Structure formats: structure tokens, C-alpha cells
């Protein structure tokens, strides 16, 4: 059930979705499943070994009732998709609280904000919004162990600007009312909370200024949060980074801190002290550093991302710390051993190691050998205290930056993802718990992951795929080679080695649409190769802003987007982190600024028209300034003048704008909360998000041959929408669009009556000028009725399905079938061809 919220942005989003002509069109998820994504929050009900709640950073909340064999999303139609924390009441296990907004703030990256706190009293079946929407990033939800009405929230606040909403909040009435009980200042939030299980009035909080500061530190309350005092005895004086707190359940006077000490290091190769473990044996009144092992490399310079610490509920000297790797100590934090790399997976992958970058560890209090670990590769389960793991990689939550397609049958989708490398998968992939994931990795790093962005097949030789690591590391992989290890014998680095180059995290790269041997790469200059990357030359002067001028908004001062006209070779447009937009009409010989009157914000997309060489599209994002206004522009005179296309778009950051290759009036926009369509060249917009989960859409592309829109989401993988009702509108009162032929494999499913998993289904689009019930009838070539059923049509475009079974629940034989829709006296029909593969 969708919670009723009244924030203006969410109200505008829902209003467009529910009024859209296309609200009945169903998106089809196609994966991938097996690569996972960043799991930042885990909760298990007490005494229940089958139920697990997993919060994915930007991929909603998921639940299993069978210890990870199958999963379902619980939180996919709310105003927030980013999960900061999830907590289950110990006294009432059906009560689940969610704090939204990622607790992993990033410079130049995506740590999406949330809209406050949500609560379910039925195990996640329905949700109620409890407010605190202005906190943006909630790092912890802490529930009283016996009183379900009492809860505490640690709020980091707005990431990019001063925020009075930071601090600790308390409710005494189940979330109806909130009181801020700890506030440091507008730049210092709270990143962790812990309580004494034997005295729930005793609380600990770690205050943190991203990335470091002196106002933060450890605070303690002995009166359920009414008053707080800072604890300093034996702790470093600062600057202090992130930290986590763990109270030993068996001996609550023993408290641990795992912190990022940002004080200058005495070692020349280290800018600061880094990871340290502190222990108190008097409930936090005094502390001593206990680690004798050097922990600097546990997270190196990335302490703002990690520091989780957990204590065994039965042994106060057994603890775990998380960073790039995960470690265990059996001697109270003096020495640490890395957890094991023996991995089994629900879905098989080529990876062999435990994924890097660990964010959450839960120890089962009933069985401390049972661990649940969340990292950048998903969720891992251990029954031997971390010596071996089962990777529960059966949740479709890939965080995609980029998507492209080819023209094979079925066409393939190429994608670059955060943390989980470059991928390729078929557009007819079926997502269910019985079907192996057909996606495969273009490459993997040695830790079964890697950040990847633009991923493109070589147009001249399908064996080769171009892909990127961050910051300009362009590679080419021979997919028929002996290894998919990036940097291995089958991959080749194409990174330019010219002096003075600076690259943005997501480096723009493309293959020229006019010459497949010509590649372009965007740094602080535009780089070009005419020999597939063997040699490069700069074809522009410095185009970016001064590097490091503003670390948040302009981290490198390089190009973020670069594109060439599909109509005229050598017309190039590039955009930078700081909002500069450049044009060359002579393949880089000369460049001019064309950004007069445009916002000085991160250029999120540059698109050149398929229909008019002088028409350009731009989108900008104010994400890094906490500005969610939509910035979309068009120029019809090669950038001399610009006109806003924001029109009725809701307040959502825009990540991409594309023009339909067949019709210049059809435009598509992907935002931080969905997809929008314009039929009138941007004068007005309608939503395509009604059947899409709340998810950021980072990229989209039109597959023209199959007339489908493919989107890459940052948290829910790739999705496909039929464009036939959009590209070919009809004036008929009832119209059934042609159905694509379907090929069925004969085994093994035919031998398992009633099991439809893994089976293709027929999908077809129907447009109706009024809402109401329709009768669908499938007849064979001989005219006999094969199947008949009722469907409720919305006014506008609808997606209907048929499971390819007869009235007697048997599979239909190969043949040509007529499919008819009838509403009242209106009838419309088309044909469907079913084939058998003969395998």
C-alpha cells in the first residue's frame, strides 16, 4: 500500500503518474540479478531464522521469509528509494521501521537523500510515513527493546549544504511526534547510535562532520536522550572522522568504538592516522586504544564510507570491523584476521572472492556463528562466523550508470554499473526464482566487482567490448579470450597517456557514429583516436574549470558529457562539472562557449538531434547543491540561444534527455525518480513511471528496431517499455497492437505441469478510449477458442499478458493464433505466432 504523503514533490510526481495516458503500460524488468548491489542495512526478527530485511542503498527494501531463497520488494512505491537503516522491534517483530536516505555520503558520487522515517506494523505489507523528511540522510534507527513506542533516529542531514535538521530525534508515541534531543551544529550530524541492552535509558551517539571536524565525537545520555554530555577521556582530540559504536550485549559496561582518526600521521606515506579501535570498560567514561595491528588499510582514505563494528552477543572479546575488507578479533580488538573468501552463490558467477566494501554486519543473537554481511556486492550469509559464505545474489538491484543496445536477436543490453563492473544481457531475460540469470560480466576485477560506466560493443567486431573504469580508464575486452579479469590477458588498456589530463569520475566516451574506428574521450580536453585507441591526440584546449575549486560541485573540473552529431561528422558538444558548454563544428579545430544564460551546474547530458543538425539538448543537475529543480534545455540554432523545456516536470533532478530517432517531437527524460515523455517537443510532459518502482533513472536509450525504451536505473537494473502506442498513436476507440513472435523451448518445463517459472509470456499493448472491462479471446487457426479471460482496461495505453496456456492449463502448440479484445461493441484483433525451438 502506498503511504499517504503530502510533500509537494511527491504529490506532483504521483499526480503526473496517475493522470498519464500511459499509466497502464507495464515496464518489464530484465535484470541483472546475480551481481547484487550495495546493501547498507540488514535486520532480522528475534527468533526467526527465515526472515531477513535487506536495505539496498538506492534499490528499496527487500524481504525474504525463507532465509534468502526468494525475495520480494517491500518499499518500491514510496517517495524514497534510498535506505539508510531498517530496524525490527524486538517486542513486536511485525513492526518494522525504515530510515531513508543513504548513510554513505560521497564526494562527486551518488548518495541519494530520503524523505524521513516510515513504519510498518504488518511486516512490510503496508507503510505509514512518520515525517522527518527534511533530515535527508538517516544513518540509524534505534528501537527500545521492550517499549515499541520509543524510537531514536540519527540524522546526518542534508549532504551538500548547512542543515539544522542534523542530530538525534526521539519519539515516545510510535512516531506521531518527534523531538530533537541532540544537536551539535548545522554541519555536524549524527552517524551512529547505540544503547545499553540492560539499561535502555543509557544511549551513545557519534556526531560527525562530513568528512572530518572537531565539533563531533562521542556523546552519552543516561536519561533516554533528555540530556547529553561529551565523552573524551582517552579518545583522540581530532580532527575526527566517522565512527561506529558497539555495546557488548553480555557485558554492557564494555563499549567499543571503531573510528577514523583524521589527526595528522607521523608516517610520510599517510596523511592521517586512519582506523583505530577503542575500548571502554566503564560504560564510556574512559577509553584506551586496543588495536596493536595496524588498521590504516582497513579503509585507507575512505573512512567516511565505513567503520561498522559489532560485538558477539556471548563473547565481549569477539568483535568484527568493516572496511574495504571485513575482519574479526578474538582478543578484544588487539589483533584482527580477515574474514574468509570461500564463497558459494545462489546464482553462479565467475567471481571467486568476497566482494569489497562492507557496510553492515548482523550477528544472530540466537546463533552467533550465523552472520549476515552487506557490502557493495549484495548480501552474504555465513554459518561459521565468516570463514565461508553463501552469496544471496538473487535480488535484482544493479546500480547502472549507462545502457546501450545492439541489433542482435534478441537484442543485447550493455551496461556499466557502480561496484559491479560492465555487463551484457539479453533483452528477453526472465526474472524469476527458477531461471538462471543470463547476464554476464564483460570484465571483473580480482574482488568480483569494479566501477564501470560507458560500455559499448565494437561495431566492426562483436568479439570486442569497450568499457571504462572510473577517471578515464578506458579498456577493451576480447570477450572470447581466456580471462575476464580487467588487466588480464584478454583486456587492453586504451587510456590516453598525455600530460596534464584530468578526468571526471564518469568519463564521457563514445564511438563515432560515422566511423567505428574513431573514438572520443572527454577529460579537461577532448581526446580523439582514429585507430581504435592505439594512439590519441588532444583536439581541444583546456575546457574545464580549475580542479578542486569546489570539491563538492566541481571535483576535477573536467568534462562530464561529450557527444557528436549523428547527422554531420565533426559537430561536437561537451559539458563540464561546473556548467560550461562547448561547441566545435570542425572536429575540434576550434571551440566556442555556448552556455550563455544557462545554469552553472553539473552537465548531466548532451544530446544532438537525429533530425536537425542545429538542434541540441542539454540537461543539468543540481544534485550537489541540494537543488532538485529540473533543468532541461533545447537550442535550434547550434547553441546561440536556449529555451527551457522544464515545463510541467516535477522537482526531480534530470539525468538524461533523449530524442526519439523516428520523431523529433518525442522526447524522453530520466530523473532521480522516474521517466517522462513529451509528445510535443518538450512543451509538456507526461509520466511513464506509474508501473515503475521509485528509482533513479541514470540513462535511457531507444531500441528502434523493436520499438522499445530501455532504461538503466541506479538501484533496480534495466527495464523495458513497449513504445508502439507512443510512436504509433491511434484514433481508434479500441486498438490492439501487433504482438511479437514467441519461441518456446520444449523442455524441461513441459514435463512440470503448472510450473510457469522461466516460461515466456505474450505481452501486448491495447489502447482504449474509455476505462472498463474487456474480453480477451485467443483462437487457433481452425477457429476454436484456445483461451478466454476478462481484463480491466484503463483509459489510454495498457499492457496485457497471456501465459500461452489453454483453458485446460496446457501449453499451446506451435502455430498462428488470433488475439481479439472486445469491449462492448468494439472489437480489435491481431495475430501471434508461436514457434518451438526444437532444442
Predicted regions and their residues:
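Terminal processing/anchoring signals of secreted or surface-associated proteins
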Residues: 30, 718, 764-766, 783, ...
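Glycine-centered coil/turn sites that cap beta-strands in beta-rich domains
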Residues: 619, 744-774
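Glycine-centered tight-turn motifs at strand-turn-strand junctions
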Residues: 782-812
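C-terminal tail/sorting-segment detector
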Residues: 818-839
Amino acid at each position: 500500500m502506498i503511504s499517504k504523503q503530502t510533500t509537494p514533490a511527491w504529490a506532483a510526481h504521483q499526480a503526473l503518474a496517475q493522470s498519464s495516458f500511459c499509466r497502464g503500460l507495464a515496464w518489464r524488468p530484465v535484470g541483472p540479478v546475480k551481481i547484487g548491489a550495495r546493501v547498507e542495512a540488514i535486520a532480522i526478527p528475534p527468533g526467526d531464522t527465515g526472515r531477513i530485511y535487506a536495505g539496498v542503498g538506492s534499490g528499496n527494501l527487500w524481504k525474504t521469509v525463507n532465509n534468502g531463497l526468494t525475495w520480494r520488494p517491500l518499499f518500491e512505491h514510496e517517495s524514497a528509494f534510498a535506505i539508510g537503516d531498517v530496524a525490527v522491534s524486538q517486542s513486536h517483530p511485525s513492526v518494522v521501521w525504515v530510515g531513508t536516505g543513504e548513510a554513505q555520503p560521497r564526494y562527486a558520487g551518488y548518495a541519494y537523500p530520503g524523505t524521513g522515517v516510515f513504519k510498518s506494523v504488518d511486516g512490510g505489507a503496508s507503510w505509514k510515513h512518520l515525517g522527518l523528511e527534511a533530515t535527508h540522510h538517516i544513518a540509524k534507527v534505534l528501537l527500545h527493546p521492550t517499549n515499541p513506542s520509543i524510537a531514536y533516529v540519527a540524522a546526518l542531514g542534508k549532504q551538500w549544504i548547512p542543515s539544522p535538521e542534523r542530530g538525534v530525534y526521539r519519539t515516545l508515541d510510535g512516531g506521531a511526534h518527534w523531538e530533537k534531543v541532540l544537536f551539535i551544529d548545522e554541519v555536524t550530524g549524527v552517524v551512529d547510535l547505540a544503547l545499553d541492552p540492560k539499561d535502555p535509558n543509557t544511549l551513545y551517539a557519534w556526531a560527525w562532520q562530513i568528512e572530518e571536524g572537531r565539533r563531533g565525537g562521542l556523546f552519552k545520555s543516561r536519561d533516554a536522550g533528555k540530556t547529553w554530555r561529551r565523552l573524551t577521556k582517552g579518545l583522540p582530540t581530532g580532527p575526527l572522522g566517522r565512527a561506529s559504536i558497539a555495546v557488548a550485549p553480555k557485558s554492557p559496561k564494555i563499549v567499543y568504538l571503531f573510528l577514523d582518526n583524521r589527526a595528522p600521521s607521523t608516517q610520510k606515506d599517510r596523511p592521517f592516522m586512519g582506523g583505530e579501535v577503542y575500548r571502554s570498560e566503564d560504560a564510556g567514561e574512559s577509553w584506551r586504544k586496543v588495536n596493536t595491528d595496524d588498521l590504516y588499510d582497513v579503509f585507507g582514505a575512505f573512512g567516511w564510507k565505513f567503520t561498522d563494528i559489532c560485538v558477539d552477543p556471548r563473547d565481549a572479546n569477539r568483535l568484527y570491523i568493516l572496511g574495504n575488507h571485513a575482519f574479526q578479533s578474538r582478543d578484544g580488538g588487539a589483533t584482527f584476521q580477515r574474514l574468509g573468501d570461500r564463497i558459494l552463490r545462489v546464482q553462479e558467477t565467475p567471481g571467486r572472492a568476497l566482494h569489497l566494501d562492507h557496510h553492515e554486519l548482523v550477528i544472530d543473537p540466537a546463533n552467533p556463528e550465523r552472520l549476515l554481511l552487506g557490502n557493495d556486492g549484495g548480501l552474504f550469509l555465513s554459518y561459521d562466523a565468516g570463514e565461508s559464505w553463501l552469496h544471496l545474489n538473487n535480488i535484482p538491484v544493479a546500480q547502472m550508470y549507462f545502457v546501450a543496445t545492439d541489433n542482435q536477436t534478441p537484442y543485447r543490453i550493455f551496461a556499466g554499473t557502480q561496484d559491479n563492473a560492465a555487463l551484457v544481457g539479453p533483452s528477453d531475460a526472465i526474472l524469476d526464482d527458477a531461471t538462471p540469470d543470463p547476464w554476464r560480466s564483460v570484465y571483473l576485477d580480482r574482488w568480483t566487482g569494479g566501477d564501470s560506466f560507458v560500455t559499448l560493443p565494437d561495431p566492426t567486431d562483436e568479439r570486442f567490448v569497450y568499457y571504462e573504469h572510473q577517471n578515464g580508464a578506458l579498456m577493451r575486452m576480447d570477450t572470447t579470450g581466456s580471462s575476464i579479469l580487467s588487466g588480464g590477458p584478454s583486456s587492453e588498456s586504451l587510456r590516453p597517456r598525455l600530460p596534464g589530463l584530468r578526468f571526471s569520475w564518469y568519463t564521457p566516451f563514445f564511438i563515432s557514429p560515422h566511423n567505428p574506428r574513431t573514438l572520443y574521450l572527454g577529460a579537461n580536453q577532448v581526446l580523439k583516436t582514429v585507430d581504435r585507441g592505439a594512439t590519441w591526440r588532444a583536439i581541444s584546449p583546456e575546457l574545464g574549470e580549475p580542479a578542486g575549486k569546489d570539491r563538492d560541485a566541481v571535483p576535477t573540473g573536467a568534462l562530464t558529457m561529450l557527444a557528436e552529431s549523428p547527422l554531420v561528422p565533426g559537430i561536437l558538444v561537451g559539458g563540464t562539472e561546473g556548467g560550461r558548454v562547448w561547441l566545435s563544428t570542425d572536429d575540434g579545430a576550434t571551440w566556442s562557449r555556448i552556455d550563455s544564460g544557462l545554469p552553472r551546474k553539473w552537465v548531466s547530458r548532451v544530446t544532438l538531434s537525429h533530425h536537425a543538425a542545429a538542434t541540441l539538448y542539454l540537461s543539468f543537475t543540481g544534485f550537489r547543491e541540494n537543488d532538485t529543480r529540473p533543468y532541461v534545455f533545447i537550442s535550434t540554432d547550434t547553441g546561440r540561444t536556449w529555451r527551457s523545456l522544464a515545463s510541467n516536470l516535477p522537482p526531480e533532478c534530470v539525468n538524461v534527455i533523449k530524442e526519439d530517432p523516428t520523431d523529433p517531437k518525442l522526447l524522453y527524460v530520466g530523473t532521480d525518480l522516474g521517466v517522462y515523455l513529451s509528445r510535443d517537443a518538450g512543451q509538456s510532459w507526461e509520466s511513464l513511471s506509474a508501473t515503475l518502482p521509485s528509482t533513479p533513472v541514470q540513462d535511457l536509450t531507444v531500441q528502434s528496431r523493436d520499438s522499445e525504451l530501455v532504461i538503466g536505473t541506479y538501484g533496480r537494473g534495466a527495464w523495458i517499455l513497449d513504445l508502439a502506442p507512443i510512436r504509433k498513436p491511434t484514433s481508434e476507440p479500441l486498438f490492439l497492437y501487433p504482438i511479437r513472435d514467441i519461441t518456446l523451448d520444449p523442455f524441461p518445463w513441459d514435463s512440470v505441469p503448472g510450473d510457469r517459472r522461466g516460461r515466456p509470456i505474450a505481452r501486448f499493448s491495447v489502447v482504449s478510449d474509455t476505462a472498463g472491462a474487456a474480453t480477451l479471446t485467443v483462437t487457433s487457426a481452425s477457429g476454436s477458442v484456445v483461451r478466454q479471460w476478462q481484463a480491466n482496461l484503463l483509459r489510454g495505453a495498457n499492457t496485457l499478458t497471456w501465459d500461452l496456456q489453454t483453458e485446460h492449463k496446457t501449453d499451446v502448440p506451435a502455430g498462428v493464433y488470433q488475439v481479439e479484445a472486445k469491449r462492448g461493441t468494439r472489437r480489435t484483433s491481431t495475430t501471434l505466432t508461436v514457434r518451438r525451438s526444437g532444442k
